[in-house]
From Swiss-Prot:
Basic and acidic residues bias locations: 1-14, 26-39, 85-94
CDD domains: Ubl_BAG1
Region (Disordered), start-end ranges: 1-113
GO biological process, one term: protein localization to mitochondrion
Name by which UniProt lists this protein: BAG family molecular chaperone regulator 1
Subcellular location: Nucleus; Cytoplasm
Protein's organism: Rattus norvegicus (Rat)
Lineage: Eukaryota, Metazoa, Chordata, Craniata, Vertebrata
Chain positions covered by the region annotation Interaction with PPP1R15A: 229-358
């Protein structure tokens, strides 16, 4: 230390320093030349060159001559390509892991969303199914109620009846025992609404007179709202009484006609040989007596009809009486035919020498 920098003075006796003296020019030029020469060398050899130039091998730091070692910036060693690749691969691995985790998270979230959606859809489907079943049940119940109502309520038909200048809106319902309304039901309803008795009525539908009382209205082509025209006058008490008499006589004619039909059948059995020959004579005598009583009954009916005096204004009564007389005359003619056959069979038995009871 004494050789390099001389003797050190004690700190307490330090004298004020004077201005720093520069080194001689020759020495400065030498350092500059050294530095210039040293610039072309690598950093590992620069210190030795500098020492050789100064004439001794020592460190320049702290030299008494005041020469300082120039500071050299420490260069950052560039990363090698292998380290960069490793870092890049690590970053790629990290980014891939993040991407995978994100994908897994997204997949899990999507799966959860799909499960929730599936549950909601299943719930909605169940609700819709339940609602449809309830609707079907209600519809079936309503249909059953409608069917029961239709079965309980008989079919009806609305008809518009016109009489002179009057109009009647009627609702025809079938009577007990009929599945649908017939002409008889319509005529009775017209009688109640208009006051025209059924015998005096003439109902016309589409230009045709409704005469058959047992014909269903649907068979005539009648539908709801159809129009029916009524021709006839309201009842006359006197004529109504005459009509009642004629009706009673008509019932008697029907009964007598039924009796005549039975006699005609018995005669047919005898003619076909269904009865034994020994019994035929007695049966023929009995038939002869019955046919004569039947003829007498028809004659009495004709007499009662003839005794009825009907004014000319009783057109319906007069027409009914005329038709009844014709009917009785037809039955009388049939009685004459039966009586004639009885006589022929009796003569045939007599010709075969069969004794007839007295």
């Amino acid at each position: 230390m004494a050789d390099r920098g001389g003797a050190r003075r004690p700190r307490g006796d330090q004298e004020p320093l004077g201005p720093r003296l520069r080194a001689p020019r020759s020495a400065r030029e030498t350092r500059q030349s050294e530095s210039r020469a040293e610039r072309g060398l690598p950093p590992s050899q620069r210190s030795s060159v500098r020492s050789a130039a100064s004439g001794h091998d020592r460190s320049t730091r702290g030299a008494a001559s005041g020469a300082c070692k120039p500071r050299v910036k420490k260069k950052v060693r560039p990363r090698s390509s292998q380290s960069e690749k490793v870092a890049h691969s690590k970053e790629l691995t990290r980014s891939k892991k993040l991407t995978r985790s994100k994908k897994v998270t997204g997949t899990q979230e999507a799966t959860q969303v799909e499960e929730v959606t599936t549950i909601e859809e299943a719930t909605q489907t169940e609700e819709i199914t339940v609602a449809e079943e309830v609707t079907q049940t209600e519809n079936m119940a309503q249909t059953e109620e409608m069917v029961q109502t239709e079965e309980m309520e008989p079919p009806t038909l609305s008809v518009v009846v016109t009489h002179s200048n009057e109009r009647y809106d009627l609702l025809v319902t079938p009577q007990q025992g009929n599945s649908e309304p017939i002409v008889q039901d319509l005529a009775q309803l017209v009688e109640e609404a208009t006051g025209v008795p059924l015998p005096f009525q003439k109902l016309i539908f589409k230009g045709k007179s409704l005469k058959e009382m047992e014909t269903p209205l649907s068979a005539l082509g009648m539908q709801n709202g159809c129009r029916v025209m009524l021709i006839g006058e309201k009842s006359n008490p006197e004529e109504e009484a005459e009509l009642k008499k004629l009706k009673d006589l008509e019932v008697s004619v029907e009964k007598t006609a039924n009796h005549l039909e039975e006699l005609n059948k018995e005669l047919s059995d005898i003619q076909q040989g269904f009865l034994a020959k020994e019994l035929q004579a007695e049966a023929l005598c009995r038939l002869d007596r019955k046919i004569k009583a039947t003829i007498e009954q028809f004659m009495k009916i004709l007499e009662e009809i003839d005794t009825m005096v009907l004014p000319e204004n009783f057109k319906d009564s007069r027409l009914k009486r005329k038709n009844l007389v014709k009917k009785v005359q037809v039955f009388l003619a049939e009685c004459d035919t039966v009586e004639q056959y009885i006589c022929q069979e009796t003569e045939r038995l007599q010709s075969t020498n069969l004794a007839l009871p007295e």
